[in-house]
Amino acid sequence: MGQNLSTSNPLGFFPEHQLDPAFKANTNNPDWDFNPKKDYWPEATKVGAGAFGPGFTPPHGGLLGLSPQAQGILTTLPANPPPASTNRQSGRQPTPLSPPLRDTHPQAMQWNSTTFHQALQDPRVRGLYFPAGGSSSGTLNPVPNTASHISSVFSTTGDPAPNMENITSGFLGPLLVLQAGFFLLTKILTIPQSLDSWWTSLNFLGGAPVCLGQNSQSPTSNHSPTSCPPICPGYRWMCLRRFIIFLFILLLCLIFLLVLLDYQGMLPVCPLIPGSSTTSTGPCKTCTTPAQGTSLIPSCCCTKPSDGNCTCIPIPSSWAFAKFLWEWASVRFSWLSLLAPFVQWFAGLSPTVWLLAIWMMWYWGPNLYNILSPFIPLLPIFFCLWVYI
């Protein structure tokens, strides 16, 4: 190589060459390679049998190093004996290939013959066609059901899952009605309080309403007459006013119901006499056709004809009209029949008992309401559970 810096492989990346980082740069004979046996460039043109073929000997001993084999010198090496493990057969032998089915079971190739179906009775032949143990035709016995008896009791294979939508809707319906009922109840309870405030304001024109029956134990406790505490003497008068307001609201609801029934044609009317265009004469009687019959519109007679029909005026006495409304509601809401014994007992009370009950509610009702008010929301829940479960 000498001082020729353009020689091949100057940094000695091939075998048996070492790199000198300083390559004697500070000397008169700089060099990159520490190998003392490296070939000089003029010797690379000599003819010789090297690793790259005859006539070319690469510098530095060739790509494969300085060994005789690298320089193209062929030597005969003794062959090593094979390992001892290959001299004998040991362990599991490979599974031989299975012969074709047409050679082992020629009758199986005849698909439409009875011989093939008979051959399928052989478990070995069946395994070739139906590894899972199935059947190809209806002539074969089906695979027995391996399901346990306990599992067949609780569920049948293939049954669809229960419809959770129908199950949840049966509970969500009453709960939504209950929630709407509580919402309406809270709104309805504010109506008597507003009417009570308007009623008491009539006695205090031009001034703020102040309760005249203040508690003697606390003369300085001024309060509104619409929010008297139970210890105030004006508390019972407040309850009486609200009771009258409730009756007035019920009367308005009854009038609205009568107007609605009359608009829908469900009020009792007099039937026409067959063969005539006029109604029958006679006193107004109670309804003769109950609501559970074929017709939901009861028929009765009256003395005020109007275009062939007439409305029963006055409304049938006693409980006739209430009985009709009850029967009409019982047809549409079957669970109301469970309240029939209680309603019959309540309707059979004498007027004296009614007045006594009203007086007790007016006198002890506020105190009982304060005691039972935490449990009142539970009553509709228990009632729904009792009806639907």
From Swiss-Prot:
Transmembrane intervals: 171-191, 243-263, 338-358, 365-387
Coiled-coil annotated residue ranges, if any: none
Residues carrying a glycan: N309
Region (Pre-S2): 109-163
Region entry Pre-S1, spans: 2-108
Record topological domains on the Virion surface side: 2-170, 264-337, 388-389
Keyword Protein transport: no
Source taxon at top rank: Viruses
Residue positions of covalent lipid attachment, annotated as N-myristoyl glycine: G2
Region (Pre-S): 2-163
Record's keyword terms, sorted: Acetylation, Caveolin-mediated endocytosis of virus by host, Fusion of virus membrane with host endosomal membrane, Fusion of virus membrane with host membrane, Glycoprotein, Host-virus interaction, Lipoprotein, Membrane, Myristate, Transmembrane, Transmembrane helix, Viral attachment to host cell, Viral envelope protein, Viral penetration into host cytoplasm, Virion, Virus endocytosis by host, Virus entry into host cell
InterPro entries: HBV_HBSAG
Composition bias, Polar residues: 85-95
Topological domain ranges for the Intravirion compartment: 2-242, 192-242, 359-364
Keyword Repressor annotated: no
Cellular localisation: Virion membrane
GO cellular component: membrane; viral envelope; virion membrane
GO biological process terms held by the UniProt record: caveolin-mediated endocytosis of virus by host cell; fusion of virus membrane with host endosome membrane; virion attachment to host cell
PTM characteristics: Isoform M is N-terminally acetylated by host at a ratio of 90%, and N-glycosylated by host at the pre-S2 region.
Family: Belongs to the orthohepadnavirus major surface antigen family.
Summary of the function given for this chain in its UniProt record: The large envelope protein exists in two topological conformations, one which is termed 'external' or Le-HBsAg and the other 'internal' or Li-HBsAg. In its external conformation the protein attaches the virus to cell receptors and thereby initiating infection. This interaction determines the species specificity and liver tropism. This attachment induces virion internalization predominantly through caveolin-mediated endocytosis. The large envelope protein also assures fusion between virion membrane and endosomal membrane. The middle envelope protein plays an important role in the budding of the virion. It is involved in the induction of budding in a nucleocapsid independent way. In this process the majority of envelope proteins bud to form subviral lipoprotein particles of 22 nm of diameter that do not contain a nucleocapsid.
UniProt free text on domains: The large envelope protein is synthesized with the pre-S region at the cytosolic side of the endoplasmic reticulum and, hence will be within the virion after budding. Therefore the pre-S region is not N-glycosylated. Later a post-translational translocation of N-terminal pre-S and TM1 domains occur in about 50% of proteins at the virion surface. These molecules change their topology by an unknown mechanism, resulting in exposure of pre-S region at virion surface.
Protein name: Large envelope protein
Organism whose genome encodes this protein: Chimpanzee hepatitis B virus (isolate United Kingdom/LSH/1988) (HBVcpz)
